[in-house]
Amino acid sequence: MNAIWIAVVAVSLLGLAFGAILGYASRRFAVEDDPVVEKIDEILPQSQCGQCGYPGCRPYAEAIGSQGEKINRCAPGGEAVMLKIATLLNVDPQPIDGDEQEVAPVRMLAVIDENNCIGCTKCIQACPVDAIVGATRAMHTVMSDLCTGCNLCVDPCPTQCIELRPVAETPDSWKWDLNTIPVRIIPVEQHA
């Protein structure tokens, strides 16, 4: 019985000593993160889709913050994310990457053909934002409010029952295309 207490005390003291050493080392060798990169990372949609050319949102935020990467490469975030980053960095807004005009790209949404879905859950596993719901061997569906249109769920589907479709314009998603509105200047008569 006495040997058990000695072992318990010895292991407890070793745990306490190693915990103190790890605590000291974590403070001594801590790497400070750039607060601007943290703020940019919070703005990005965290879909980890890779459409920007980086493996995820954090590497893209680091590239913007420290390497001066363009702020207009996040397709799922679109114009709203680009404008927030431009405001944060105090730079001029840029057109969304791939667009030479100032028109925002059409938002895409994954749609599952539920008649052909076999319930394999491969699309659920591939979705970075958990926008697809369903169970094994049951049909799946996409929650349109959460889907970023990143296209990561399309390739894993063995029955090819997922496709991306443009989101229909609603009063919430519709925007004026000011470049297509014809403007005619009418001269004003000056009275003498």
Swiss-Prot record:
What are the record keywords, sorted?
Answer: 4Fe-4S, Cell inner membrane, Cell membrane, Electron transport, Iron, Iron-sulfur, Membrane, Metal-binding, Repeat, Translocase, Transport
Give the main EC class. Answer: translocase
**Main localization category:** membrane
GO biological process terms on file: electron transport chain
Give the enzyme's EC designation.
7.-.-.-
Q: How is the cofactor bound?
A: Binds 3 [4Fe-4S] clusters.
Region spans: Hydrophobic:
1-26
The UniProt annotation places [4Fe-4S] cluster 1 binding at: 49, 52, 57, 74
Question: Which Pfam families does UniProt cross-reference here?
Answer: Fer4_21, FeS
Cofactor annotation: [4Fe-4S] cluster
Q: Name one GO molecular function term.
A: electron transfer activity
Q: Where is the 4Fe-4S domain?
A: 32-91
Tell me its family. Answer: Belongs to the 4Fe4S bacterial-type ferredoxin family. RnfB subfamily.
The identity of this protein, by name, is Ion-translocating oxidoreductase complex subunit B
Q: Which organism is it from?
A: Citrobacter koseri (strain ATCC BAA-895 / CDC 4225-83 / SGSC4696)
* Name of the gene: rnfB
